Amino acid sequence: MSKRNQARKVGRFMTMPNDPFKYSFDRLEDVADHISDVLRCPITIEDVNHKLLAYSTHSDCTDPARTSTIIGRRVPEKVINKLWKDGTIPALLKTDQPIRVKQIDEVGLSNRVAISIWKNKQVLGFIWALEIQKTLSDEDLLTLQMAAKAVKNKLLKLQIRKTKNEERSQEFFWKMLTGHIHQEDDMADGFHKLGMAAPSEFSVMIIRINGELTEKIEQQLQYLQETTQQVYVLLATVDSNELIILTSPKTDHPFQDLKQFALSTQKQLKERYKIEDVSIAFGGIYNSISFVSRSYQEALSVLKTKERFAEETKHLFSFSELGIYQYLDVLNEKRKQAGHYNYSLSKLEQYDRDHQSNMVETLERFIEADSNVNTASKLLNIHVNTLNYRLKRISQIAEIDLKNVNQKFTIYLDIKLRHMDL
């Protein structure tokens, strides 16, 4: 039975009990304790991005997933991933009915019931009730629905406060991105006003949706950035079809952290939300916060390069991975100004035009394959002997020595610069 059908079955043919939540509580923690007292089971309350807002303290029974959530103040990422895969979270985002969640031993999750808290058509958060010492009855499930309604107003107030904080942080982030704030002391002061410490190591990442960035997609991106535990996401803002985030690594391997986060984001956008046409890039990793603007410009440069050389750079995410592509714009401008002419490349291009051949592409793939004829022949889908013959003809036509690294690299660079003008 699907999670959605379970929810329908749970909420059917039940008479609403008296409301035990008609009296208001000042603190969300008190609400969690009261729900726990009424239902006689441990309770946790989370926001829509699975950050812990409150938990009941009256019960000693728990499970490893709940313990980790309380210690880390958020649901562990491995638990979130499992709940997506088993259909629990997708179901919670579609219905306001309670949903039973079966035990998942590998992430330390015992049986529980979950319910989402709604305001109109928007999910504000979730209540989780552990079924360790008892199984919730039909009447308990109705009580849980009343609890969700009682918690709604508390979460609305938190959301309003969060929105105001986000507006302040977005304005500050934009000033750094555009260079309007560039002094390190001013930046550190800005972080302090937001209740944060300036990062000791960081990079700017851009997630570009190649299409319209709708409000729904923006919420999905925000969900991914707030639930990740691969990097720290310090600041975020949206510009047109791009989500721009200031990230800080979590381990002593910052490049690995950032690349893994980029790969994970790309994968989850595809698997969870069916969003495939997306480009992700991050700039240099710096220790001084005064380089935020530079890291941002480098991330933009990566996206520009990925557009121009889509096939060659499809597995690249970072500015440091671009290699010679970092310098193509500068070289192209310099060579245009100097009226540069590559004799060998021009000879090959003329030969291709006259004979409807592809000698330039053959040479390009050969060099990209690190001059390995076996690898290059597979890329070109031709026999090794055919490739060897072509390489011999290329040497004759272009009058170059393909064993000379300098000559090979020069003509390869000019081939790439030619692509920029197409």
Swiss-Prot record:
<dbReference type="InterPro" id="IPR025736">
    <property type="entry name" value="PucR_C-HTH_dom"/>
</dbReference>
<protein>
    <recommendedName>
        <fullName>DNA-binding transcriptional activator AdeR</fullName>
    </recommendedName>
</protein>
<dbReference type="Pfam" id="PF06018">
    <property type="entry name" value="CodY"/>
</dbReference>
<dbReference type="InterPro" id="IPR051448">
    <property type="entry name" value="CdaR-like_regulators"/>
</dbReference>
<dbReference type="InterPro" id="IPR042070">
    <property type="entry name" value="PucR_C-HTH_sf"/>
</dbReference>
<dbReference type="GO" id="GO:0045893">
    <property type="term" value="P:positive regulation of DNA-templated transcription"/>
</dbReference>
<dbReference type="Pfam" id="PF13556">
    <property type="entry name" value="HTH_30"/>
</dbReference>
<keyword id="KW-0238">DNA-binding</keyword>
<comment type="similarity">
    <text>Belongs to the CdaR family.</text>
</comment>
<dbReference type="GO" id="GO:0006351">
    <property type="term" value="P:DNA-templated transcription"/>
</dbReference>
<dbReference type="InterPro" id="IPR029016">
    <property type="entry name" value="GAF-like_dom_sf"/>
</dbReference>
<dbReference type="Pfam" id="PF17853">
    <property type="entry name" value="GGDEF_2"/>
</dbReference>
<keyword id="KW-0804">Transcription</keyword>
<keyword id="KW-0749">Sporulation</keyword>
<dbReference type="GO" id="GO:0003700">
    <property type="term" value="F:DNA-binding transcription factor activity"/>
</dbReference>
<dbReference type="GO" id="GO:0005525">
    <property type="term" value="F:GTP binding"/>
</dbReference>
<dbReference type="GO" id="GO:0003677">
    <property type="term" value="F:DNA binding"/>
</dbReference>
<keyword id="KW-0805">Transcription regulation</keyword>
<keyword id="KW-0010">Activator</keyword>
<dbReference type="GO" id="GO:0043934">
    <property type="term" value="P:sporulation"/>
</dbReference>
<dbReference type="InterPro" id="IPR010312">
    <property type="entry name" value="Transc_reg_CodY_N"/>
</dbReference>
<dbReference type="GO" id="GO:0030435">
    <property type="term" value="P:sporulation resulting in formation of a cellular spore"/>
</dbReference>
<dbReference type="InterPro" id="IPR041522">
    <property type="entry name" value="CdaR_GGDEF"/>
</dbReference>
<comment type="function">
    <text>Activates ald expression in response to alanine availability and is important for normal sporulation in B.subtilis.</text>
</comment>
